[in-house]
Amino acid sequence: DNIGIIFQQFNLLPYANVIDNIVLPIYFSKVRSANVTNQRESALNLCKQLRLTDDIDQYKASSLSVGQQQRVAVARALIGNPSLVIADEPTSSLDKDAQQIFLDLMFEQISNNKSTLLMVSHDKSLAERFDRLIDINEVLTRED
C-alpha cells in the first residue's frame, strides 16, 4: 500500500519548483507511472484543490510562504492516492485561524482520497476534529 507523509518541517527541496516537489515521491515509488504528463496534471489539480495560485508551478519552494509550503507538503503526501497519510504536527507553524482553514482543506482532500489520517499533535484543541484519539500520556500511565 501507498503511504503519504507530511513532515513537521515540510522537507521541500528549496531549489526545485513546486510541481517537482509534489511529484518527487512518485519517482521513488514502486508503482511509478510512466506518464509524466499525467503526474504533473495530477499535481496541478491538487494545487488547485488546495487553493494554491494558478501559476504556483512557476515558483521554487524557497520562495513560498509557510502556508503555501504546508499546502505543497500536503499535495506531495496525497499525490499517489495513499491509503494512509501520516502527519507530524502539520499545523504547528500556523495561527489558530490559519490552522482551521488549513485543516479544512487537508480533511477535504483526505476524504476525497478515502485515506486514513494519522496525525501527531501536541495541540489538544485539534482533538475534536478526529474520530479517534489516543493520548500517549494516558496510555503510558495505564501501562505503568
Regions found by a protein language model. Give the residues of each.
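Conserved ABC ATPase signature
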Residues: 60-64, 68
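Hydrophobic anchor residue at the start of the ABC signature
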Residues: 74
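Catalytic Walker B motif of ABC-type/P-loop ATPase nucleotide-binding domains
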Residues: 85-88
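ABC-family nucleotide-binding domains
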Residues: 95
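Conserved ABC ATPase "signature" region
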Residues: 36-55
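Short coil-to-helix segment of the ABC ATPase nucleotide-binding domain corresponding to the Q-loop/switch region
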Residues: 16-25
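Conserved catalytic motifs of ABC-family nucleotide-binding domains
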Residues: 81
